[in-house]
Swiss-Prot record:
Residues 243-477 form the Helicase C-terminal domain. Keywords: ATP-binding, Helicase, Hydrolase, Nucleotide-binding, Nucleus, Ribosome biogenesis, RNA-binding, rRNA processing. Belongs to the DEAD box helicase family. DDX56/DBP9 subfamily. A motif (DEAD box) lies at residues 176-179. ATP-binding RNA helicase involved in the biogenesis of 60S ribosomal subunits and is required for the normal formation of 25S and 5.8S rRNAs. One of its GO terms (biological process) is maturation of LSU-rRNA from tricistronic rRNA transcript (SSU-rRNA, 5.8S rRNA, LSU-rRNA). This is ATP-dependent RNA helicase DBP9. ATP binds at residues 59-66. Residues 568-586 have a biased composition (Basic residues). A motif (Q motif) lies at residues 14-42.
Length: 595
């Protein structure tokens, strides 16, 4: 979020001084490296500050939506505090709602940078952490001007702390990533929150999103009054996306692990890599397999404590880690259901006689929906493929293909940001290869070819192309027996033990992050998340690649290798041995000389 936007989004005709911002805010903006606003900012900020309009904005990821609402919120709060004649401190003036804890941390981090020079006038409460009731009441009693959290967290404090939270002076309500908020099942929470807020009175509302679905219309009617709707034609902006090169590889289930081993061990990808898997077990299995070959990686999933997750993202952005395996099991559930229904409708049109098959498909869809939602409620505030600001990612590897075409867009959107180039590689399991290797099988891979066709169709509409990528199988085959050795050592029991061990370590680390490292921030750098778990039998010989397996251009030049004797010569040792023999043959020795 704080990264500099791509040139395709910058509006060179305007500068931030033209918005007549507070000098302290202006200094913080320049200190963050921003010289010109983006297109969304140059349109939204004047409408919000001068005309006091509600804003509904649709703009692509990385276009600067966060600053488009934070700058007006901060500026108006500063103006409001200056205009107050009485000395009473106002209550909460702004509420910002985001879909996940990760985004809560990110928005708070950007907010704290912007209020760096006016922190005495504006206090921020971050609801990402699980705070005890007493601590939360203490923080709320200080009347923070801005509260940031997920809808469920905001609703919780409104219901339980009605007397503590002063919302009589509330001026702003922001819902960031609206489409994702609705998809994550927060509609009921939003309806209840609306009962507590002075909507359509003095409340200015911002609804920000990368896409505008029909569901947003209900929020528009409930939360907004004569809003200004800002949309951008993505045709010009999508020219920047040509810097994203996309490939797909048709591979068997076991060959996914083989290709990952070859790619990372031979260093075929330069720079930081983000690998997406579809469930937690897959992430740990891949990590343990790579550990067999001495390849370090760290895990990011919804089981880890929120503090640890944020620390992992921060360290990845600071180049501490170069390989991050992220679990993206919270795919867009609603989109998944819609696509399943589309499949059923197509099948019914093509073959009207197969009504039984269609009914079975409907039943299975319902089963998937209910099963997924049950798991999904547990992970409601976790999201990694959407909105999280991974910086300078050179490559995204879809180790497991996502279950929807939209989820694919969000994943590959983590690279090729801010005008930089990037690569996306997706592994696709052909239907004929599905189920041939049971230990590495993933049920969702059965639909990989269908999902791929949707992805190709969607990308072609955007003027983008996904190219097939073919490995030199002769060179890859040489590594197969080593991968079979390494994969065999990573059993289901080893994966389970790895999950337990990692969770225990991260829980301890989370407490350290929470308490100890607040007092010792320097020691925070020493806390790492890519340590080897070692619950599986590690074979050290697999960490080294024999010369004959390497491509010719990667082998050592034989002409530069000098002669290396089998035994290390020890001239001193030989002399001492000979001298002993001579002494034995020579007979008597002079006692004085010996002394």
């Amino acid at each position: 979020m704080t990264t500099i936007a791509s040139e395709a989004y910058i509006d060179d005709s305007v500068n931030f001084e033209s918005f007549k911002l507070d000098a302290r805010l202006l200094q913080a903006i320049k200190g963050s490296g921003f010289t010109h606003p983006t297109l969304i900012q140059s349109h939204a900020i004047p409408l919000a500050l001068e005309e006091k309009r509600d804003i509904i904005a649709k703009a692509a990821t990385g276009s600067g939506k966060t600053l488009a609402y934070l700058i007006p919120v901060i500026q108006t709060i500063l103006d409001y505090k200056k205009s107050r004649t009485n000395g009473d401190e106002p209550g909460t003036l702004g509420i910002i709602m985001v879909p996940t804890r990760e985004l809560t941390q990110q928005v708070t981090a950007v907010l704290e940078k912007l209020i760096h020079y006016c922190s005495k006038d504006i206090k921020v409460l971050n609801l990402a952490a699980d705070l005890s009731t007493s601590v939360l009441n203490t923080l709320l009693s200080e009347n923070p001007e801005i509260i940031v959290g997920t809808p469920s967290k905001i609703l919780n404090i409104l219901e339980r702390n009605t007397d503590t939270v002063g919302i009589d002076d509330l001026k702003f309500l922001v819902i960031d990533e609206v489409d994702l908020v609705l998809t994550f099942g927060y509609q009921d929470d939003l309806d209840k929150i609306a009962e507590y807020l002075p909507l359509k009175k003095n409340l200015q509302t911002f609804l920000m999103s990368a896409t505008l679905s029909d569901d947003i219309q209900s929020l528009k009617q409930k939360y907004c009054r004569s809003p200004a709707i800002i949309k951008f034609n993505d045709d010009e902006i999508n020219k920047d996306k040509t810097k994203l090169v996309q490939y797909y590889v048709r591979v068997g289930e076991f060959d996914k692990f083989l290709f990952c081993y070859v790619i990372f061990k031979l260093g075929l990808i330069k720079g930081k890599t983000l690998v997406f898997v579809n469930n937690i077990d897959r992430g740990y299995r891949l990590k343990l397999v790579l550990e067999q070959f001495g390849i370090k990686s760290c895990i990011l999933n919804n089981e880890l404590p929120a503090n640890s997750r944020q620390h992992i993202v921060d360290q990845f952005n600071k180049n501490v880690y170069h390989l991050l395996i992220a679990t993206d099991d919270a795919d867009n559930i609603k989109e998944f259901d819609d696509e399943q229904k589309d499949d059923i409708q197509v099948e019914e049109k093509n073959d009207e006689t197969n009504t039984v098959v269609a009914e079975e498909s409907t039943n299975s869809t319902t089963g998937i929906k209910s099963k997924t939602k049950n798991n999904y409620k547990q992970d409601k505030e976790y999201g990694v493929s959407r909105g999280v600001d991974f910086k300078n990612v050179a490559c995204v590897v879809n180790f497991d293909l996502p279950t929807t075409a939209k989820a694919y867009v969000h994943r590959v959107g983590r690279t090729a940001r801010a005008g930089k180039s990037g690569t996306a590689i997706s592994f696709v399991v052909p239907l004929k290869e599905f189920g041939k290797h049971k230990p590495s099988m993933l049920p969702s891979a059965k639909k990989d070819e269908k999902i791929l066709s949707r992805i190709i169709k969607q990308q072609s509409k955007l003027g983008l192309e996904i190219q097939p990528y073919s490995f030199d199988l002769k060179q890859v085959e040489g590594f197969r027996y080593r991968m079979e050795d390494g994969f065999r050592a990573v059993t289901q029991v080893a994966v389970r033990e790895a999950r337990i061990k990692e969770l225990k370590e991260e829980l301890l680390a989370s407490e350290k992050l929470k308490r100890h490292f607040e007092e010792n921030p320097i020691e925070l750098k020493s806390l790492r998340h890519d340590k080897e778990l070692h619950p599986a039998r590690v074979q050290n010989h697999l960490k080294r690649i024999p010369e004959y397996l390497l491509p010719e251009n990667a082998r050592t030049d034989k002409k530069k290798i000098s002669f290396i004797p089998f035994h290390k010569p020890n001239k001193v040792g030989k002399k001492s041995k000979n001298s002993k023999n001579k002494k034995r043959k020579g007979g008597k020795t002079d006692a004085l000389k010996k002394f």
